[in-house]
């Protein structure tokens, strides 16, 4: 019995892919790449959406996750600029998604606070 328990514990844990990874749109693919820690692909996908410049919630979410991607890759000044942009576009989103905290993290990491 002990052997069976030890053998079961020793098995590798296989996580299910994130639920967004089945999406066929640009945002879903970029978000899947972000969740899988493929930050180069995520950045390219989110940047493409942001550069389209559509005034919709998906673009706002793409700006947010582009900022998060920049933070994950150590580009804190770029992330701070994006977070400030979110503040200018939609203060309610900025507050709800706790962008002020993230901006503070960027400033601390950049040595500005």
Where are these regions (language model features)?
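Short solvent-exposed coil/turn linkers within tandem alpha-helical repeat scaffolds
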Residues: 19-20, 50-59, 86-98
